From Swiss-Prot:
InterPro entries: Acyl_CoA_acyltransferase, Glycine_N-acyltransferase, Glycine_N-acyltransferase_C, Glycine_N-acyltransferase_N. The modification N6-succinyllysine is found at K16, K127, K141, K142, K169, K183, K256, K267. One of its GO terms (cellular component) is mitochondrion. It comes from the Eukaryota. Belongs to the glycine N-acyltransferase family. It comes from Mus musculus. GO terms for molecular function: glycine N-acyltransferase activity; glycine N-benzoyltransferase activity. Its main location: mitochondrion. The modification N6-acetyllysine is found at K16, K113, K127, K141, K142, K159, K167, K183, K256. Mitochondrial acyltransferase which transfers an acyl group to the N-terminus of glycine and glutamine, although much less efficiently. Can conjugate a multitude of substrates to form a variety of N-acylglycines, thereby detoxify xenobiotics, such as benzoic acid or salicylic acid, and endogenous organic acids, such as isovaleric acid. This is Glycine N-acyltransferase. Gene3D superfamilies: 3.40.630.30. Keywords: Acetylation, Acyltransferase, Detoxification, Mitochondrion, Transferase.
Amino acid sequence: MIVPLQGAQMLQMLEKSLRKYLPESLKVYGTVYHMIHGNPFNLKALVDKWPDFNTVVVRPQEQEMTDDLDFYINTYQVYSKDPQNCQEFLESSEVINWKQHLQIQSSQSHLNKTIQNLASIQSFQIKHSENILYVSSETIKKLFPSLLDTKNLSTGSGKPKAIDQDKFKLSSLDVVHAALVNKFWLFGGNERSQRFIERCIKNFPSSCVLGPEGTPASWTLMDQTGEMRMGGTMPEYRLQGLVSFVVHSQDQIMTKRGYPVYSHTEKSNIAMQKMSYTLQHLPMPCAWNQWKCMPM
């Protein structure tokens, strides 16, 4: 059974239900939050039954997915309480178009087994990335405060070091900056990723510091799941604390608007982990997962 959730009331019920399963449901929760608040990426939510669902998948509407090779748009967020049910649900072509290049995102690492099983059935290759999931202490206090009982907040100051404000000016990104962001984004560097970045800049808040020449020296933005992503710093401005200043600014903007604030960092990126620690962004017991799927 596939139930599309239509209208604000059903989505608000889903959001409320997903809160009970945070932080494991975070990728889906963040996406549903932004569907309720404008839905600029034209997404839809599907569940196996309603209201007592086992599995929820958020994905674009079919008319958005016109390019079979564009896995930036062909992206699915998944949360499931039941791995067996999840596999049956994801197998359906009405839920996931397995003929396309696509990506699946989830805060549940145990879905890896389910997706590997599907790979052998549907005949596609997988590239799995598992990174550290960070959530701001303010978001934790608001959405799942019980987690703070097990965390020590006494270390990070919560504020970045001051920057030279005569040299650098806090600003936001413009669509013309998409090419620069794309060049330095680990998952980007191509035409499709640039279109995706342009769409994110147009629809969501972003932060940057402009260097003396008036172009971005460091930046961060957010995607359709509400995650802070695609951050970067020009090589000549690295090691000056600019990225922590920009992330702190973006955090404040998102918190003021009531958005959940979260991000991910590679396990090998010690500098970003230290920055997260300083800004009181806490590592979660669950991970950030992405499965890039390519038909064979």
